[in-house]
């Protein structure tokens, strides 16, 4: 999982931006 402030990208399970 990758959400702000971590930001989003290909390493994220879902586009939470």
Swiss-Prot record:
Where is it located? Secreted
Q: Predominant location of this chain?
A: secreted
Which cysteines in this chain are paired by disulphide bridges? Answer: 2-16, 3-17, 8-12
Query: Any one cellular component term from GO for this entry?
Result: extracellular region
**Which organs or tissues contain this protein?**
Expressed by the venom duct.
Q: Which residues carry this modification: 4-hydroxyproline?
A: 4-5, 10, 15
What does the UniProt keyword field contain? Disulfide bond, Hydroxylation, Secreted, Toxin
What Gene Ontology molecular function terms does this protein carry?
Answer: toxin activity
Family note: Belongs to the conotoxin M superfamily.
| Comment, domains | The cysteine framework is III (CC-C-C-CC).
Question: Protein name, please?
Answer: Conotoxin Reg12b
